[in-house]
Amino acid sequence: MRKITSVSVGEQLDSFITRMVQSGRYGSASEVMRSALRLLEQQESRDEAVRNAVIEGLESGESSMTLRDIAAERKQKHRV
């Protein structure tokens, strides 16, 4: 179910939205906004995953592996 939400944007973003619609890439300003919000959602999800990985790494302590060991392990795992 769709919900109507009003959003205020500055002239620069309004101009960008208009150009995207006029180019034919999007059928409406709403499509541009939905696309932008989907990208923001994906970016936020990736950022959260990175933050969690950093926290996990910091909490795991120091590794006994050398940089060379880590590189070799990655190469083997990804068959590079």
UniProtKB/Swiss-Prot annotation:
Keyword presence, Ion transport: no
Transmembrane parts of this sequence:
none
Q: Which GO terms describe its biological process?
A: regulation of DNA-templated transcription
Q: Which InterPro entries match?
A: ParD (IPR022789), ParD_sf (IPR038296), Ribbon_hlx_hlx (IPR010985)
Q: Which domain of life is it from?
A: Bacteria
* Cross-referenced Pfam families: ParD_antitoxin
> What does the UniProt keyword field contain?
Toxin-antitoxin system
Q: Name the protein family.
A: Belongs to the ParD antitoxin family.
Q: What does this protein do?
A: Antitoxin component of a type II toxin-antitoxin (TA) system. Neutralizes the effect of toxin ParE.
Report the protein name in the record.
Antitoxin ParD
